[in-house]
């Protein structure tokens, strides 16, 4: 059936990605992080990895729509969500929505930007430019909200820590 390992792994990845598909209340097809759609939401970090490493299994328009879904659910100050559930609940920090693990994740906007970058690499530049123009100000605002120390590094205050993933150092 398969002529090589790469073909087999691509087929397996496609099946897993297909199992991640859920339809949100607003009709947006989103991708959950677990391959069986039991997580009821779009996690920006996991989706970014999915697009980068198994994006061949996701139509460009679904990626565009997931980015739009995330941007629509940013906080009033511009902070991007950690995840957005199928019913539209935006959650900004790791953990249970009612009991977050620290302040909002420091990597929400950076991972959304990684997704935008992955999309840009697979689209014709002329087709991508209007999308980037649509998102640029919101992505920039999300980046400018990140706490930066005197050396220009993302800063995670140990007295009031954000939920980190690896883009920060805690003092």
What kind of feature is each model-predicted range?
Residues 61-64, 126, 130:
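Short, solvent-exposed positions on alpha-helices
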Residues 38-49, 58, 103-114, 134:
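Aromatic- and histidine-enriched alpha-helix N-cap/loop-to-helix transition segments
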Residues 31-33, 45-46, 136-137:
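Short hydrophobic/aromatic segments of transmembrane alpha-helices and their interfaces
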Residues 4, 131-134:
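Soluble or luminal CAZymes and related metallo-dependent hydrolases
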Residues 30, 36-38, 82-111, 117-121, ...:
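The feature captures the catalytic groove of carbohydrate-active enzymes
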Residues 1-42, 64-65, 69, 78-80:
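Low-complexity, Ser/Thr/Pro/Gly-enriched N-terminal "stalk/linker" regions
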Residues 11, 15, 69-76, 118, ...:
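Alpha-helical scaffold segments in carbohydrate-active enzymes
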Residues 46-77:
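Alpha-helical support elements that line or immediately flank enzyme active sites
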